């Protein structure tokens, strides 16, 4: 898009196409831009759309990753996954964590155990990692055992 000013309208158009009716973005970083808002429902939709992209799906499950940029001045960027559930909670394949003073501690996570998927969208948590891990484990505890 070339600039934040050009990118944000495209970001909002994609959100509408994904059915994210409760979201409006004002900043590509997810920080507290004026008028920016979202909902757990919309973030679940966004997470599902992101995980459907092979390049994203391959990286969100890693504790660390690198990405090579394209074009003039191409370089390799290193990332550390900020989702503390990755590599620590059985089956978690990542997604996104964040914090702002208005939204509090937030996390979007998906875990896969056997044939079952559990999605978690937590917003405004005081303590997110232990709470999220417990919620994921509790959700899987409700899944019936496979038949022999």
Regions found by a protein language model. Give the residues of each.
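Penicillin-recognizing serine hydrolase domain
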Residues: 2-148
